[in-house]
Curated annotation (Swiss-Prot):
Location (main, coarse): membrane
Cellular component GO terms, alphabetical: plasma membrane-derived thylakoid membrane; proton-transporting ATP synthase complex
Coiled-coil residues: none
Protein name, per record: ATP synthase subunit a
Subunit details: F-type ATPases have 2 components, CF(1) - the catalytic core - and CF(0) - the membrane proton channel. CF(1) has five subunits: alpha(3), beta(3), gamma(1), delta(1), epsilon(1). CF(0) has four main subunits: a, b, b' and c.
Family: Belongs to the ATPase A chain family.
Subcellular localization(s) per the UniProt record: Cellular thylakoid membrane
Statement: the UniProt record of this protein carries the keyword Nuclease: no
Gene Ontology MF annotations: proton-transporting ATP synthase activity, rotational mechanism
Record's bilayer topology term: Multi-pass membrane protein
Species whose genome carries this gene: Nostoc sp. (strain PCC 7120 / SAG 25.82 / UTEX 2576)
Length: 251
């Protein structure tokens, strides 16, 4: 019985969170496996874009049809969250976020990264690393600050005392909680999904984890949609003109 337990304790230990392939660049210590899988995801997106645009047809088919559908979906999402007048410049940013997160999430389930052995750690979805999700959340924060300042200038700070002045500390705290919630929600969901599927694959036959993997693909797509939707909503909120709305209501 002891030998049986020891047999299963070895592979389960390999699922330990925190093992990384480190790259030392000067004084910086980088997570190498995150860069490798991120470059893979970027390469997939670039190849798909080139394939879709190299031979454009009036009646789209194949990869062109798929990417045109994705573009229309992202454009509608941005229009609904940001507004019809302001959304167009932000479609590339929101679309890049959505597609990168979507492909990253799915790569962890569909690409056999586990077959590639590294000196330390293992290859997983880029979004299962907190550094990736924090970087995406900080980019979103910079984007909505830029959106607000580009439209309102210093008047953007007026949002911090709307509708009443004592909202100022709560609005400042909100600026910190937005990237925190974005990053930890995405990181937690993707990491948990990979760990659950990994444990099930070790403990039970192949076909038993398949429903869990299918559910993981669905939730991964939903997480990409949630992140992109919230990013667009924050940008729209930063550019929202409260004074303009009040003026229209009086008329």
């Amino acid at each position: 019985m002891l030998n049986f337990l020891n047999f299963y304790s070895v592979p389960l230990a390999e699922l330990e969170v925190g093992k990384h392939l480190y790259w030392q660049i000067g004084n910086l210590k980088l997570h190498g496996q995150v860069f490798l899988t991120s470059w893979f995801v970027i390469g997939v997106l670039v190849l798909a874009s080139v394939a879709a645009s190299s031979n454009v047809k009036r009646i789209p088919s194949g990869i062109q049809n798929l990417l045109e559908y994705a573009l229309e979906f992202i454009r509608d999402l941005a229009k609904n969250q940001i507004g019809e007048k302001e959304y167009r410049p932000w479609v590339p940013f929101v679309g890049t976020l959505f597609l990168f997160i979507f492909v990253s999430n799915w790569s962890g389930a569909l690409v056999p990264f586990k077959l590639i052995h590294l000196p330390e750690g293992e290859l997983t979805a880029p979004t299962s690393d907190i550094n990736t999700t924090v970087a995406l959340a900080l980019l979103t924060s910079l984007a909505y600050f830029y959106a607000g300042f580009s439209k309102k200038g210093l008047g953007y700070f007026g949002n911090y005392v709307q509708p009443v002045s004592f909202m100022l500390p709560f609005k400042i705290i909100e600026d910190f909680t937005k990237p925190l919630s974005l990053s930890f929600r995405l990181f937690g969901n993707i990491l948990a999904d990979e760990l659950v599927v990994g444990v099930l694959v070790l403990l039970v036959p192949l076909f038993v984890p398949l429903p869990v993997m299918a559910l993981g693909l669905f939730t991964s797509a939903i997480q990409a949609l949630i992140f992109a939707t919230l990013a667009a909503a924050y940008i729209g909120e930063a550019m929202e003109d409260h004074h303009g709305e009040e003026h229209e209501e009086h008329h």
